[in-house]
Amino acid sequence: MSTTAELAELHDLVGGLRRCVTALKARFGDNPATRRIVIDADRILTDIELLDTDVSELDLERAAVPQPSEKIAIPDTEYDREFWRDVDDEGVGGHRY
């Protein structure tokens, strides 16, 4: 099952949940328990819509990720300490070596 089909099925299921919650609210009235369930169903639907957006963006990002073209060789030569001679160590502050 593809992601699109799964999300479509999830939308349908939550739509059914929302219809059931609305019927319960009509039957039992507007009380704190039914309001909480309505809010929860709305929140689930909103989260699914956000997930749908995120999945679309992730698919675009996967398609846009460039493949590495070449490896960069890192030499095994001795480290040049003169390169960092006038730089402060962030962890130590203004300490000079």
Curated annotation (Swiss-Prot):
Where N-acetylserine occurs, the residues are S2
Please verify whether the record's keywords include Acetylation: yes
Superkingdom of source: Bacteria
Q: Report if keyword Acetylation is assigned.
A: yes
Its keywords, alphabetically, are: Acetylation
From the Swiss-Prot or TrEMBL record, give the protein name: Uncharacterized protein Rv0250c
Organism name:
Mycobacterium tuberculosis (strain ATCC 25618 / H37Rv)
